[in-house]
Amino acid sequence: MGDRERNKKRLLELLQAAGTGNGHCADCGAADPDWASYKLGIFICLHCSGVHRNFPDISKVKSVRLDFWDDSMVEFMTHHGNLNVKAKFEARVPAFYYVPQANDCLVLKEQWIRAKYERQEFTAIDKAVSHPGNREGFLWKRGRDNAQFLRRRFVLLSREGLLKYYTKEEGKAPKAVISIKDLNATFQTEKIGHPHGLQITYRKEGHTRNLFVYHDSGKEIVDWFNALRAARLQYLKLAFPDLPESELVPLITRNYLKQGFMEKTGPKHREPFKKRWFALDPQERRLLYYKNPLDAFELGQVFLGSNEQGYEVWEDLPKGIRGNRWKAGLTVITPERKFIFTCPTEKEQREWLESLRGVLSSPLSPLHLLTTSAETGCGLG
């Protein structure tokens, strides 16, 4: 066996070695990484390897299977590995800081990787980890009634638990004052059409208000995201002092479980089917629907209780009901009524069924019962 094959075999054994963490990407957790940084000593996935290529002074990457590895490189990988390197570069990651997963957008992964290895924000044991606290700056915000993005000043007051934004730079009165209590932030780069697109939502007069913003700097928008998360965690600790931090962290911000177009009919089931954009919020157990993906407010929402409370989802439509253009149907059963939807493809239907069943099969948590009043579903169409 030549050096090439022998070293490849050693690397593949390292990938599977117990207690090393090498079987998942060191940066996003994706399973079975095929690349490695031979300068840092970590195994990473293809997507994260692309980010590492951008700073060769800090990290240099090779394919585990396709590139040539000499003995010294393999020895370096053997004496390092994912868990050992994480112990150094992730020694002091704040609880509020969002650690991206495999399916997260590129800007989150890129800034996480740069924060770890380039800026080394989480390494030195004697270095105090700074809390973002208050924050002020400009973001590009989409207009409520048009598609134009305009520059707006945002001010986060962490201690007061408020986010404000202003339509005029010198304006005294803010356009909106948003309580951190009801705020969520989630990256929606495809929907917004910008690689740094962030969706901020909050409750307003019984509805969910959507703000769509971005910043040209990836670092700036991720810093805003984590500052909002820090303020949210601070609020949760005050609101639920008896709960451990580990139970509060998953509640800081959340992503939609599933989004996409479906068609729906009205409560009498005789109304025409209309195309709507749907977003499933698993934490608040709401299926929200909009006329368009970037609308400021939802047209309506369906509260999703648990199977134990009589909530179900059926594959297909009730007998005698026919959709408009789309035939792959599903029916959400609540104690008050049936909500009937059709999906553009059978694949979409399967994904919606799986997502909805996942929410309905999970019991309402005590925290959810404290913070959310059960709603049966309402809407305009």
Swiss-Prot record:
Domain spans labelled PH: 132-233, 255-361
GO cellular component, one term: cytoplasm
Gene from which the chain derives: Adap2
Pfam families: ArfGap, PH
Presence of the UniProt keyword Iron in the record: no
Record key words, sorted: Cell membrane, Cytoplasm, GTPase activation, Membrane, Metal-binding, Repeat, Zinc, Zinc-finger
Name under which the protein is recorded: Arf-GAP with dual PH domain-containing protein 2
Lineage, uppermost ranks: Eukaryota, Metazoa, Chordata, Craniata, Vertebrata
GO biological process: heart development
Recorded GO MF terms: GTPase activator activity; inositol 1,3,4,5 tetrakisphosphate binding; phosphatidylinositol-3,4,5-trisphosphate binding; phosphatidylinositol-3,4-bisphosphate binding; phosphatidylinositol-4,5-bisphosphate binding; zinc ion binding
InterPro entries recorded: Arf-GAP_dual-PH_domain, ARFGAP/RecO, ArfGAP_dom, ArfGAP_dom_sf, PH-like_dom_sf, PH1_ADAP, PH2_ADAP, PH_domain
Membrane keyword on record: yes
Zinc finger (C4-type): 25-48
Compartment(s) of residence: Cytoplasm; Cell membrane
Residues annotated as domain Arf-GAP: 9-132
Function, as annotated: GTPase-activating protein for the ADP ribosylation factor family (Potential). Binds phosphatidylinositol 3,4,5-trisphosphate (PtdInsP3) and inositol 1,3,4,5-tetrakisphosphate (InsP4). Possesses a stoichiometry of two binding sites for InsP4 with identical affinity.
